[in-house]
Swiss-Prot record:
Homodecamer; pentamer of dimers. Binds only one seryl-tRNA(Sec) per dimer. Its EC number is 2.9.1.1. The modification N6-(pyridoxal phosphate)lysine is found at K295. It comes from Shigella dysenteriae serotype 1 (strain Sd197). This is L-seryl-tRNA(Sec) selenium transferase. Pathway: Aminoacyl-tRNA biosynthesis; selenocysteinyl-tRNA(Sec) biosynthesis; selenocysteinyl-tRNA(Sec) from L-seryl-tRNA(Sec) (bacterial route): step 1/1. Its main location: cytoplasm. Transmembrane segments: none annotated.
Length: 463
């Protein structure tokens, strides 16, 4: 060991001496003596490695308390951190999908703070059913006979198949064998449910006769899967639920549909592309329809199954139902969200998902122009800050080919180096409230469709 190396090692402080320093008193009060000591030991080991490998001291050795505070502050941050979503995707799966209405947030807080009548009947002091209130709401909103709630739509599809078709065949068009995020595939779900997939037709064309020829004595269901996260266009053919129901009645085989996104209102009245609604499919004669709570419906993550009373009863009594049931927080948020649908005239104001989807490009453009000046003043030395038109997407596999006109703030490096964009995006991800945009075509884009809190946005970006 050289004299220089020995000198560097000698500069490393003893833990006891550090702990006696007044700057560590508040750290010990905040994070606990044990955790502070553990981290100091770890940092001493790191410092010794740096000395051994590079013959230098780490820069943070100049202020141990500051480094400990920085590390423990970061460590104490929740893994689920609030972010500002300016990606242009409204229902961003990786960012938690639908924002909850204030009524839903309040309902969840109340359910967390207090015992609630989750499975308790106040009328007769007996045991109630956790789905009952929500089922009644869904029946009122959609006109269905009954409903069942589980923790997400994948669970809804699994339960629907396991309870009604285990050990039998389910007929599905080859063009509807979807895969969603996380490698969730309809054929895999069928195997888990104990069903045998009988695929018919081709990728782009399936006829009624394809279903007819597939039905045999072991057929339990005819199934439609809404291709909500992709679109097959061109030379195509598919039969709709009404035609499939007519065939099912003729062959005495029920029809079920995995709708995926599931909107309870006609989106076209808000100027958005129309998406199939559960109540329309039930009115057409479909026995069961499953859909998500946290996509176009705008509520919490949940799987909702609506349909015929006798079919729902089979789902409720299946052993999987208990394993897949939703908890009280989910049910509280979903009930509060569904109650908003009882007053459709205020829905686009009170339901965040619909409010964000219906923001006009003109309003977003004005917002972008208002924000451009302070950001250009702050970043103008390195980047050209411009207002540019862009297209938002709905996200989470909803209306995959449809785009919403919007406006963005774009940041283009004066020297044209892409590494500067990556560096800027990384800096924004390290903010107390990270700002998430997207890099495309030599620019960093901040689509402002989902920006409602301008003050917080400016506080973050002007730091």
């Amino acid at each position: 060991m050289t004299t220089e190396t020995r000198s560097l090692y000698s500069q490393l402080p003893a833990i006891d001496r550090l702990l006696r320093d007044s700057s560590f008193l508040s750290l010990r009060d905040t994070y606990g003596h044990t955790r502070v000591v553990e981290l100091l030991r770890q940092m001493l080991d790191e410092a010794r490695e740096v000395i051994r490998d590079s013959q230098t001291l780490p820069t943070w050795c100049e202020n141990w308390a500051q480094e400990v505070d920085a590390r423990l502050t970061k460590e104490a941050q929740s893994a689920l951190r609030p972010v500002i979503n300016l990606t242009g995707t409204v229902l961003h799966t990786n960012l938690g999908r639908a924002l909850q209405a204030e009524a839903a947030v309040e309902a969840v807080a109340q359910a967390m703070r207090s015992p609630v009548t989750l499975e308790y009947d106040l009328d007769d002091a007996g045991r109630g059913h956790r789905d009952r209130a929500l089922a009644q709401l869904l029946c009122r909103i959609t006109g269905v006979e009954d409903a069942c709630i589980v923790n997400n739509n994948a669970a809804a599809v699994l339960l629907m198949l396991a309870a009604t078709a285990s050990g039998k065949e389910v007929v599905v068009s080859r063009g509807e064998l979807v895969e969603i995020g996380g490698s969730f595939r309809i054929p895999d779900v069928m195997r888990q449910a104990g069903c045998t997939l009988h695929e018919v037709g081709t990728t782009n064309r399936t006829h009624a006769n394809d279903y007819r020829q597939a039905v045999n004595e072991n057929t339990a269901l005819l199934m439609k899967v809404h291709t909500s996260n992709y679109s097959i266009q061109g030379f195509t053919k598919a039969i709709d639920e009404a035609e499939l129901v007519a065939l099912g009645k003729e062959l005495d085989v029920p029809v079920v549909t995995d709708l995926g996104s599931g909107s309870l209102v006609d989106l076209s009245q808000y100027g958005l592309p129309k998406e199939p609604m559960p109540q329309e499919l039930i009115a057409a004669g479909v026995s069961l329809v499953s859909f998500s709570g946290d996509k176009l419906l705008g509520g919490p993550q949940a799987g909702i199954i609506v349909g015929k009373k006798e079919m729902i009863a089979r789902l409720q009594s299946h052993p999987l139902k208990r394993a897949l049931r939703a908890d009280k927080m989910t049910l509280a948020a979903l009930e509060a969200t569904l109650r908003l649908y009882l007053h459709p005239e205020a829905l686009s104001e009170k339901l965040p998902t619909l409010r964000l989807l219906t923001r006009s490009a003109e309003v977003i453009q004005i917002q972008a122009q208002r924000l451009q000046a302070p950001l250009a003043a702050h970043y103008g030395a390195e980047f050209a800050v411009q207002v540019m038109p862009c297209l938002s997407q709905i996200g989470s596999g909803s209306l995959p080919v449809d785009r919403l006109p919007s406006a963005a703030l774009t940041f283009t490096p004066h020297d044209g180096r892409g590494s500067h964009l990556e560096s800027l995006a990384a800096r924004w991800r390290e903010l107390p409230v990270p700002v998430i945009g997207r890099i495309y075509d030599g620019r960093l884009w901040l689509d402002l469709r989902c920006l409602e809190d301008e003050q917080r946005f400016l506080e973050m970006l002007l730091k």
